[in-house]
Amino acid sequence: MTTTSPTTQRRQPAAAALLVDFGGVLTVPLERAFGALSVESGLDPRTALRLLATHEGARTALGEHEVGRLDDEGFEDALAAAIAEVGGRVEARGLLARLAHHLDLDEPMVDLVREVRAAGVPVALVSNSLGRDCYARVDLDELFDVTVISGQVGVRKPSRQIYRIACERLGVDPGQCVLVDDLEHNLVGAARLDIRGIHHRTADETIPRVRAALGLPTTTAA
């Protein structure tokens, strides 16, 4: 009787393309930015995100904004109204710009995208919209071969259609792609197209997993 050691078991072939989320993956966690907005409004740090999940007006506005049916100002008005209902003090106009101000880049993750693209692996941004200033800190053309932003294509994650669009624009079969996202339900949606998923928590965890999935060296020269 023979046995196969874990190190000799067949591995998945390397993925041919990378799909990557923006907020919470290439930036600090969204909870941090929304927490700062909540505190500035005189509320508990968890309030703004809770309202987006539970307040009918704010939740509906977010969904409409993400698919491009509600502009920045309309979303700002809805979220500001929800914040005011629970006793917060916030100026609606410029709310999204202030939120973007708190959305600092996670530089090691941004550098990973540069590394992957420099290695010849096509990279697509697949992101749900969050205001016109959301991507102001990065050069999208430098980092990505393709950008698929929900408000521009009329469909949002976790719908399979947004991932189909990204794969079609890259010219790569979905089964040859890997997606990095900080939200589990977005990964579940992509998995329905056989897109592999990496649940992002920290750069230290994600970077070696992305390199391994793409068949890239697991370490880089200092």
At which residue positions do the language-model features occur?
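N-terminal helical cap/lid subdomain that shapes the substrate entry/recognition surface
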Residues: 3, 8-110, 118, 130, ...
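Structured helix-beta-strand junction loops
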Residues: 119-120, 143
